[in-house]
Design a protein with these regions (language model features):
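Flexible N-terminal pre-Rossmann segment of NAD(P)-dependent oxidoreductases
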Residues: 1-9
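N-terminal Rossmann NAD(P)H-binding glycine-rich loop of SDR-like oxidoreductase domains
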Residues: 14, 22
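Rossmann-fold cofactor-recognition segment
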Residues: 48-62
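Conserved glycine-rich Rossmann-like NAD(P)H-binding loop of the short-chain dehydrogenase/reductase
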Residues: 28-43
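Conserved mid-core segment of classical short-chain dehydrogenase/reductases
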Residues: 83-101
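Amphipathic alpha-helical dimer-interface segment in Rossmann-like NAD(P)H-dependent oxidoreductases
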Residues: 105-119
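Conserved Rossmann-fold cofactor-binding substructure of NAD(P)-dependent oxidoreductases
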Residues: 60-73
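Rossmann-fold scaffold of SDR-type NAD(P)-dependent oxidoreductases
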Residues: 11, 75-84
Length: 119
C-alpha cells in the first residue's frame, strides 16, 4: 500500500506496536500524528523522532481528540494501538469487577476516537 503523503493518526503511538507503526509510516512517506495520554512518553518520543508529531491526549477527552484531528487535517488512516493489557492479563474467572470495568472503558475511549476522527 502506498501511503506517501497521506495523513495518519495513531492513538497509543508512543510505545510498542503504535510507535513501530508511526516510525514505519513516517519512513514510508506519510505525515504522522502520534498520540498518548502520557506526557513523559510524548516528550521522549518527540525528542527521538522529531519528524513525527507527538501529542498528549486522552481518549476520554473529546475536546483533546478534536484538537488532535483538526491539527492533522484530512485524515486518511486512524490506527488504534492504545492498550490496557495489564488490566486483563488474568484468567477470566480471576478478574475483579474493577478490572473488567477498566478494560471496557477502552471501548468508550475508542468510541470518542471514531466520533472525533471520522468526518
Amino acid at each position: 500500500m502506498d501511503i506517501q503523503g497521506q495523513n495518519i493518526v495513531i492513538i497509543g503511538g508512543t510505545s510498542g506496536i503504535g510507535l513501530a507503526t508511526a516510525i514505519a509510516a513516517q519512513k514510508a512517506g506519510a505525515n504522522v500524528w502520534s498520540a498518548s495520554r502520557s506526557t513523559d512518553k510524548v516528550s521522549l518520543c518527540q525528542t527521538k523522532h522529531p519528524e513525527i508529531q507527538f501529542s498528549q491526549v486522552d481518549t476520554h477527552d473529546p475536546e483533546g481528540l478534536k484538537s488532535l484531528f483538526q491539527s492533522a487535517g484530512r485524515i486518511n488512516h486512524i490506527v488504534g494501538a492504545a492498550t490496557g493489557a495489564d488490566r486483563t492479563m488474568l484468567p477470566f474467572m480471576e478478574q475483579t469487577d474493577e478490572q473488567f470495568r477498566e478494560a471496557f472503558n477502552k471501548f468508550w475511549g475508542y468510541t470518542n476516537v471514531v466520533r472525533q476522527g471520522v468526518p
